[in-house]
Amino acid sequence: MSAKPRFVMCICTGQCPGFKSLDLWELINTVRREMDVEYALVHPQLCVDDGDRFLKDYIKDDGLYIIGACDPKMQRKMMKEAFEAVGVDFEKMVIPLDLRNLSTEEAIKKVQEAVEAAK
């Protein structure tokens, strides 16, 4: 099992007004360089067909996932099936974070808190 969580950022096509105050590249680079994560990556839209295929290829039953995206309830609804298809319990292995309508600094803080809680 991976000792460090993996951070996945879904940017909702880059057009979601909820992310207008977020500097995506500052966030992702801060997470990958300064936080205790296995790695950090960006996907343009996890809740569509190619996002579903990506998750099924990407997910492994050996670690925790922190997903920065929209409302956690929506993440659960849209992504839970992909996790279950590969035998991973979404409720136990995913920390869904709503990073919409946050400044870059606020989003960094929220991700850092999740990383610390995952230890």
Task: Mark where each language-model region is.
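Iron-sulfur-associated redox domains of electron-transfer enzymes in respiratory
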Residues: 1-119
